[in-house]
Amino acid sequence: MRHVTIKADTAFTKGRIDDRIYGSFVEHMGRVVYTGIYEPLHKTADENGFRGDVLQKVRQMGVTAVRYPGGNFVSNYDWRDGIGPVEKRPRKRDLAWKSIETNEVGLDEFMK
């Protein structure tokens, strides 16, 4: 069996890591997007359908950057499917999460 030993000297610093590097990502999994951050009929939804209560909590967490889309969802994602008129966007099988992706929320909506 192989062993690895790591020693960290907390008195030695190379430099400071900018706090803006710490971010998060949004993945189309479960209720993260649909009925999560995006729910047009929710009482706190803005004109783009994003929930104000969820966005407020994200701001309180201090997230400085959000990658969209993220996670395993991107393994089958084509950015062109999430732009243009929503009614003309293709519905596709999401191979990562075994569901149907409606592309109701895409890059156009997220970047607003």
Question: What are these model-derived regions, one by one?
Answer:
Residues 1-112:
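Non-catalytic accessory regions flanking glycosidase/transglycosidase catalytic cores in CAZymes
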